[in-house]
C-alpha cells in the first residue's frame, strides 16, 4: 500500500493557536500512517491559498491540510478573510484534483473559542483528506 504524503499550510497570526494546531495535525497524520512532506507557515488565513498552490503543485504530495484561526474583530473583516480564503482553497483543491482538509476556524469566533477548538479543527482536517468511494 502506498503511503499518503501531505503538505500542511498553517496561518501563524495567532502563534499559540497555530503551534497547537500544527502539532495536533502532525500527530494525527502520524497515527494514520500519513507522511508530512511539507509545512508552510504564512502570516494569516488570507495568505493560505498561495502557499497551498505551491504545495499542491508538488508531485510528491497527494493531499493537503490548511490550518489557522480567523477571529472576530470590531468589523466584518474576519468574514471577508474567511470566506475569500475558503473559496480559493476549494478552487485549488478542484484545480489540482487533490483533497484539502480545511482546518481554519472562524469567522465570528472569539480567541477563547479558537483556542478551545484548535485541536479538534486540526484533527478533523487531517481526517477530511480521505475521500470515501461509494
Model regions and ranges:
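Short beta->alpha junction loops
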Residues: 38-46, 106
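Glycine-rich phosphate/diphosphate-binding loop of Rossmann-like nucleotide-binding domains
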Residues: 3-41
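Glycine-rich phosphate-binding loop
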Residues: 50-88
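C-terminal binding/interaction regions
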Residues: 78, 85-134
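Amphipathic, non-transmembrane alpha-helical secondary structure
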Residues: 23, 46-53, 57, 116-119, ...
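Short, ordered loop/turn segments at secondary-structure junctions
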Residues: 12-13, 69-70, 105-108
